[in-house]
Every structure is written in structure tokens, then in C-alpha cells.
A protein has these predicted regions:
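Structured catalytic-domain cores with a bias toward divalent-metal coordination
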Residues: 1-251
């Protein structure tokens, strides 16, 4: 999968029809000098529409979102799409490479780093890019998490209570598209600096998930993620077709 290395973020083409793969270079005073974070932009050829942003690998030891996001970056066909999809399947790339929750470069938890800092350490600069370049463009934000090494959740999608009733109603509707046994609603913020909190505060339709656990990639969790994301694209009229049921696609 050929990609273009980007050192100046204004060189990213977010608008032309087609699919483009990038590696975003964030300077780091290490052996290779840069951390390369993958980003894929898919602009549909069926016309304008909403923008859906998909994140995996916010924590590096949570694998289901990384697998689902990477597959979708390869499979989504611009000819079948309206609107735009932005995918960052390995958001905290240093943590993904190391299989750790926090980045080994600066010890920072990406999901406590938002809205980021353009002059901070690597994790804060990645978070700042996401806030200013991706969330600003998005209408719908999907942050795919799982339990990682130490937590075990039932499969669930999630969102937070927000002051805007219309925003919360659509989030409740979208959360059900992942066809998980549970939808978890956070009554208050669990911490500061979350990607989902930042997106919700910007008025975006924002959904998180917990889709796996342990030192493995859970197949059913990947399917919930893949089918859920595609269902969201159908809900938003980016893709045509009927909604899928995640569990019906699991072959035991």
C-alpha cells in the first residue's frame, strides 16, 4: 500500500475525490528522527456528504480497532462512497509498535492528551493534529477501544451525556449500530483529555467502544468494529445498502 510521507500538514489533500494514504511525520529526537503516523483519506465519488473520522490504536495494546481500521482503509472504495472518511487506525503509533497503553517515547496516555499541544511532546502534538485537522473536519467521530492487557469489558459501544439534546439523540441511535449487547452511557466525564470528550464538546456525533481484552485480537470484537463502522457509513448515507448484524457474520 503506497503512502506519501507528510512533513507539512497543509500538504494533506482532504478534499479531492479518491483514496490517499499518508504517513504523518512528527519529529522526535530518536534514532530515526520522526514518528510516522498513518492516515487515510477516502473522498467519495458519489457526491458530497458528511465526514466520518475513525480512530484505532489510541491505546497501543488494544488491537481490535487497529485491525478493523486498517482493513477498512484498504477496502473502502471511493466509487461506492459519498462524503468523506478519515481513518487513523494506529493513532498512537509508538504505543502500537510497543504493544503498550501509553507511548514509550514520552510516557503519555494519548487518551488523556487532548486537545493537544503543538509544542508539546510527541503524543501531545499528535493529539493537536487530530483536534485541529481531523475533528474540525468531522461530523461523526468513532474511537474504537478495547480492554487491552488489564481490563475485560463486555462488548459495548458508548457515549457521554451532553447538553445538546439533538446531539445526544443521534449518538444514542448511532451507538446501537455496532450491534453490541450493551450500550454504555457515561453520566459524567471519567477523566480529562479524552478524544471523545473533545469531539463531543465540538458538537460531533461521537461514539466509543470496548470490543476486546487480553493479549490477543478478539475476532468478534473486530467484526463488531467493522460492521459497526460500515453501519454508521450507511446511517450517514455515505454507503448504500441495508444495515448489517455483527453477530450474524460470526462463523463458529
Amino acid at each position: 500500500m503506497p503512502s506519501t510521507t507528510i512533513h507539512t500538514f497543509s500538504d494533506i489533500d482532504f478534499d479531492s475525490p479518491g483514496k490517499r494514504h499518508y504517513e504523518l511525520a512528527f519529529h522526535h529526537d530518536g534514532t530515526w528522527g520522526n514518528v510516522l503516523v498513518p492516515l487515510t483519506v477516502v473522498n467519495g465519488q458519489r457526491g458530497p456528504g458528511r465526514t466520518v473520522a475513525v480512530f484505532g490504536g489510541t491505546h497501543g495494546n488494544e488491537y481490535e480497532g487497529q485491525v478493523a481500521g486498517w482493513r477498512l482503509s484498504l477496502e473502502l472504495d471511493p466509487a461506492a462512497l459519498a462524503g468523506r472518511v478519515i481513518l487513523m487506525p494506529r493513532l498512537c503509533t509508538p504505543a502500537c509498535d510497543a504493544g503498550t497503553r501509553e507511548s514509550p517515547l514520552d510516557g503519555v496516555n494519548m487518551n488523556r492528551a487532548f486537545p493537544g499541544n503543538p509544542r508539546g511532546s510527541t503524543t501531545y502534538r499528535i493529539a493537536h493534529f487530530v483536534t485541529t485537522q481531523v475533528l474540525e473536519r468531522a461530523d461523526v467521530v468513532l474511537d474504537i477501544h478495547s480492554g487491552g492487557r488489564v481490563l475485560r469489558f463486555p462488548f459495548c459501544s458508548s457515549f457521554h451525556e451532553v447538553p445538546d439534546a439533538a446531539q445526544e439523540r443521534e449518538m444514542a441511535e448511532v451507538a446501537r449500530l455496532f450491534d453490541t449487547p450493551f450500550v454504555m452511557i457515561y453520566a459524567k466525564a471519567m477523566a480529562s483529555g479524552l478524544l471523545t470528550d473533545e469531539a463531543e464538546a465540538m458538537g460531533k456525533i461521537t461514539i466509543g467502544t470496548e470490543l476486546g481484552h487480553g493479549e490477543a485480537t478478539i475476532r468478534q470484537g473486530v467484526r463488531h468494529a467493522e460492521v459497526g463502522i460500515r453501519n454508521v457509513l450507511r446511517h450517514c448515507a455515505l454507503l448504500a445498502g441495508d444495515l448489517e448484524n455483527a453477530l450474524s457474520l460470526i462463523h463458529i
